Amino acid sequence: MLKVERLVVQQNDFSLRADFIIESECHIAVLGPSGAGKSTLLGAIGGYVPLKQGSVFVNGRNVSNTQPDQRGISMLFQDGNLFPHLTLTQNVGLGLRPTLRMTDAEKEQVHQALMCVGLAGFESRKPGDVSGGQQSRAALARMLVQAKPLMLLDEPFSALGPALRNEMLELTLEVAREASATIMIITHDPKDAERALDQILFV
C-alpha cells in the first residue's frame, strides 16, 4: 500500500500538494496537463524530489527520509536510463548490483527477466544496436529484477508509436501482476488509462 500524507513540494513559484492512499496491487494512471506536476509527484514519492512537508509510506513504513534505493520503490524514467556502453544484460544487471559483480543466481534472474520481456537472444547487444521498443523492454526488465512492491513509471513509452506503446503497457501490467506490485504510470492517453488501469489519479 502507498500512502501519501499531506505532501507538499515547493520548487520556486511552483507548489504541489497531495494526499491519497493506493491499495496494494492497484494499477494507477496519473493524468493531468503538462506542467501540473505529474513527474514531480512521482519523483517525490520515489525520493528524487525533496519534500517541503508531509510523509510517504510504503506498506506502512515511513520512507520520507530514506534514500531512493531503500524505499521499496523502482522507477522507470521517460528515457529509460540505459547506459549506451553496456550490454542489455549489464543494463538489467544494474538493477541488482551497481557493481555488476553478480552471482550465478543473479545472472539467471537477469536472463529470466530479459526472456520475460521478449529479449532472449539480445543479451549481448548494446542499446544503440536495438530498436526503441526493445530499449523500453530492457528498461522494464531492469525494473522487473528489482522485485520492488511499488513501480513508478514516468511516461516511459511516450516516444513509441501507438501500437507499440499499447503493447508495452500491456506487458508492464503483466509484469506488475506477476510481481504482485502496485504501479503508478504517467500517461497522456485517457484511453490507455481507461482500458488497462484500475484507477485514475488527476494532478
Tell where the protein language model's regions lie, with residue ranges:
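ABC-type ATPase nucleotide-binding domains, specifically the catalytic core motifs of the NBD
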Residues: 66-67, 86, 90-107, 116-117
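Catalytic Walker B motif of ABC-type/P-loop ATPase nucleotide-binding domains
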Residues: 151-155
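ABC ATPase NBD coupling module
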Residues: 62-79, 98
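Conserved ABC ATPase "signature" region
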Residues: 104-122, 173-174
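Helix-to-loop junction immediately C-terminal to a conserved catalytic motif
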Residues: 46
